[in-house]
Swiss-Prot record:
A divalent metal cation binds at D178, H180, D267. Phosphorylated by PKA on serine 39. Phosphorylation reduces deacetylase activity observed preferentially on histones H3 and H4. Residues 14-324 are annotated as: Histone deacetylase. The gene is Hdac8. Its activity is inhibited by trichostatin A (TSA) and butyrate, 2 well known histone deacetylase inhibitors. It comes from Rattus norvegicus. It is an enzyme of class 3 (hydrolase). Substrate binds at D101, G151, Y306. CDD domains: HDAC8. It holds the Pfam family Hist_deacetyl. This is Histone deacetylase 8.
Length: 377
């Protein structure tokens, strides 16, 4: 089954950078919403021996100063305080978004600093020319605001990564393929024309975070530099790729980015408890290949993904896409092998749910976006 393909980053002899250390995986495993997910992802990548074809870089921990390039001092200090005490009932926590979906558990500050550091380290590798593609599957926490946690996200590592890349690259394109709207990243850059944010996501009444309608286009100097593609339940690979390619083609021509940050949350994949989109890693892989053919400095991040085995399948497959490797269908024996039953294969089959996306509505959205991008100079 091992058919060598043209690597997706062909033309670049530099191997991708892969952010990893045992300590990093161990701290990322501690997130209550995705326990041990980081270990499952890394173990499967290792089982397919993909780590041997990448440059493994140990992440630094983000300093207070680095985190404060986006987050407020007051928020960071509060996060540090409750993290040391494991104080879930601090009276100020509610105003900082802590509690409910972002519990203030002990050690949460160290977790946030580790993730932020992972993405900043990856961005720095791109700046230093150590690679053309840098991967931090444990990053991609796109909901956090400058002064509040939101949607399982305590620190917005995607924003920190973009800010770091801006030291070298003038125009940065952020593409968010998570099931949820990348609201924290969009908000952070809504007033600037230096960062364009593109988000494909589920948009429906009562679905978190409730933002990201196609009329959300940015503000002030950043007007038309936010692109939102609202999608309904049941979408599958072919239609999703058609939408993604159509939008990215227009975006690339209009904006001419110098670097790309790609958030690849796996909660769009069939079998996710979110039970919304009906994608497989192959569809996301086609979108990834489309971005990689631009041959720009590219920072790859994870994000959502609550069916842990499917998330590991997805990100391992996508790592294979980046390396130009076709992976064997049989899951290799490794520490988490039993999680891949009953069939123990890499492929994911879409479920039999109806696709709620009507072709004329999709065309309307694409036409609207194309019209908006005419204003981008």
């Amino acid at each position: 089954m091992e058919i060598p393909e043209e690597p997706a980053n062909s033309g670049h002899s530099l191997p991708p950078v892969y952010i990893y250390s045992p300590e990093y995986v161990s701290i990322c495993d501690s997130l209550v919403k995705v326990p041990k997910r980081a270990s499952m992802v890394h173990s499967l990548i290792e089982a397919y021996a993909l780590h041997k074809q990448m440059r493994i870089v140990k992440p630094k921990v983000a300093s207070m100063e680095e985190m404060a390039t986006f987050h407020t001092d007051a928020y960071l200090q509060h996060l540090q305080k409750v993290s040391q005490e494991g104080d879930e009932d601090h009276p100020d926590s509610i105003e900082y978004g802590l509690g409910y979906d972002c519990p203030a558990t002990e050690g949460i500050f160290d977790y946030a600093a580790a993730i932020g550091g992972g993405t900043i380290t990856a961005a720095q590798c791109l700046i230093d020319g150590k690679c053309k593609v840098a991967i931090n599957w444990s990053g991609g926490w796109h909901h956090a605001k400058k002064d509040e946690a939101s949607g399982f996200c305590y620190l917005n590592d995607a924003v920190l990564g973009i800010l770091r890349l801006r030291r070298k690259f003038d125009r940065i394109l952020y593409v968010d393929l998570d099931l949820h709207h990348g609201d924290g990243v969009e908000d952070a850059f809504s007033f600037t024309s230096k960062v364009m944010t593109v988000s494909l996501h589920k948009f429906s009444p009562g679905f978190f975070p409730g933002t990201g309608d196609m009329s959300d286009v940015g503000l002030g100097k950043g007007r038309y530099y936010s692109v939102n593609v609202p999608i309904q339940d049941g979408i599958q690979d072919e239609k999703y790729y058609h939408i993604c390619e159509s939008v990215l083609k227009e975006v690339y021509q209009a904006f001419n980015p110098k670097a790309v940050v790609l958030q690849l949350g796996a909660d769009t994949i069939a079998g996710d408890p979110m039970c919304s989109f009906n994608m497989t890693p192959v569809g996301i892989g086609k979108c990834l290949k489309y971005v990689l053919q631009w041959q720009l400095a590219t920072l790859i991040l994870g994000g959502g993904g609550y069916n842990l085995a499917n998330t590991a399948r997805c990100w391992t497959y996508l790592t294979g896409v980046i390396l130009g490797k076709t992976l064997s269908s049989e899951i290799p024996d490794h520490e988490f092998f039993t999680a891949y039953g009953p069939d123990y294969v890499l492929e994911i089959t879409p479920s039999c749910r109806p696709d709620r996306n009507e072709p004329h509505r999709i065309q309307q959205i694409l036409n609207y976006i194309k019209g908006n991008l005419k204003h981008v100079v």
